């Protein structure tokens, strides 16, 4: 008995192990039991993933097997039952309008595509391809966040709790591309915290990693590029002073800003922009939604404040409940959700995770907490503005 208890204790002591165990257990349950294609826009992500699994990168007119196209469309008629019997005839195809998920870069559907490809090797039915795509997405999310928790220096328990929120597992155990987006957000957040808590100079491999992450963020969702904003406030100790940069002309060495820091940040921004432009060139069409030109805020920008009031503040509106509860467990296109009382233990657990701190590891971060907090709040405001005005 003591042997098994010691294993449980060792599991709980390491947040990354606890995350991986719970994520896989509840994720598999969700992947199997949640009705297929019932998750928000899952049928669109299924069409995109299946097309990529067939090796087709299409943008304007897309070709799918008729069985796959019919299965995706049957959701609108209320059919969410899985079909494991009828095999997909890949030669009996239909060409028509592409799914709304086609504008995403292929990296957003890479795990689902691999799962569908493997399913086609065994028994190419719609039921099995959807299930394998879900499981592959879950594995990618769980393993990625596991390594991110291992890697981040501070806030490991916060990463664990947020990564295990019911909505996060629900999306990861589906064909949704939001799992990839969530991994990207976890990654840049961990990278930012590691840099702020680092006492030594920035290493070359970290600079390369930053450039790669910048491109990755842009390819998930373009608005994620705003997550690079807190890096503008990185402490000076990470960078070599201008006077010690031997290859830099003396005129530039007298600049008030750190050349190494701003060269890296400008480079990260250029990589993000280049990644977007390259994908748009490959895709052959605009990546913004078709409704963007008709955005009412373009005609009256002051409506932005009215929308904010009616969304977050006005007590007579029902959106507050959707937003707060939706962040925890509003599932499947808002058709069903967790009971409201679940919010209380969820927020309590998040609070406990915030209190679980290691002062030794946070020592280098402490002088910059105010600066980082301002940067994060500003980033959130930029997100709201970007989504409201551009998307």
Task: Kindly give the residue locations of the regions a language model identified.
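Membrane-interface alpha helices of multi-pass inner-membrane proteins
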Residues: 170, 206-222, 226-233
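Specific aromatic-rich, kink-prone transmembrane helix
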Residues: 147, 182-200, 208-214
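Short acidic/glycine- and proline-prone juxtamembrane loop motifs at membrane-interface regions
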Residues: 174-181
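Transmembrane alpha-helix segments characteristic
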Residues: 23, 363-391
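Transmembrane-helix signature of polytopic, membrane-embedded enzymes
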Residues: 124-127, 146-167
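Perimembrane helix-loop-helix junctions
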Residues: 1-3, 191-201, 208, 227-270
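Membrane-lumen/periplasm interface segments of multi-pass, membrane-embedded glycan/lipid transferases
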Residues: 255-258, 277-359
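Interfacial juxtamembrane loops and adjacent helix segments
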Residues: 53-133
């Amino acid at each position: 008995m003591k042997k098994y208890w010691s294993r449980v204790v060792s599991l709980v002591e390491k947040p990354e192990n606890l995350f991986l165990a719970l994520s896989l257990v509840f994720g598999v349950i969700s992947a199997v039991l949640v009705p297929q294609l019932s998750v928000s826009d899952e049928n669109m992500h299924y069409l995109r993933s299946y097309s990529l699994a067939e090796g087709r990168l299409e943008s304007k007119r897309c070709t799918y097997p008729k069985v796959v196209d019919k299965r995706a469309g049957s959701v609108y008629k209320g059919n969410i039952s899985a079909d494991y019997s009828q095999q997909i005839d890949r030669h009996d195809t239909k060409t028509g309008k592409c799914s709304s998920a086609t504008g995403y870069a292929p990296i957003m559907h890479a795990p689902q595509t691999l799962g569908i490809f493997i399913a086609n090797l065994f028994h190419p039915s719609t039921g099995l391809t959807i299930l394998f795509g879900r499981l592959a997405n879950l594995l990618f999310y769980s393993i990625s966040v596991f390594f991110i928790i291992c890697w981040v220096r501070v806030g490991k328990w916060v990463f664990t709790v947020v990564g295990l929120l019911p909505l996060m597992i629900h999306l990861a155990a589906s064909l949704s591309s939001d799992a990839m987006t969530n991994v990207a957000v976890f990654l840049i957040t961990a990278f930012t915290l590691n840099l702020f808590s680092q006492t030594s100079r920035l290493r070359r491999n970290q600079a390369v990693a930053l450039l790669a992450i910048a491109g990755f963020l842009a390819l998930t969702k373009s608005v994620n590029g705003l997550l690079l904003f807190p890096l503008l406030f990185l402490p000076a100790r990470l960078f070599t002073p201008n006077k010690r940069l031997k290859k830099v002309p003396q005129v530039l060495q007298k600049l008030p800003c750190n050349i190494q820091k701003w060269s890296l940040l400008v480079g990260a921004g250029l990589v993000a922009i280049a990644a977007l432009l390259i994908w748009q060139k490959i895709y052959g069409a605009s990546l913004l939604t078709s409704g963007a030109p008709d955005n009412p805020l373009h005609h009256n920008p002051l409506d932005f404040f009215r929308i904010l009031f009616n969304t977050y503040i006005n007590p007579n509106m029902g959106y507050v409940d959707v937003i707060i509860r939706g962040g925890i467990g509003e599932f499947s296109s808002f058709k069903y959700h967790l009971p409201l009382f679940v919010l209380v233990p969820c927020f309590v657990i998040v609070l406990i995770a915030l209190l679980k701190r290691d002062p030794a590891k946070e020592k280098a971060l402490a002088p910059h907490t105010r600066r980082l907090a301002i940067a994060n709040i500003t980033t959130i405001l930029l997100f709201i503005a970007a989504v409201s005005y551009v998307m």
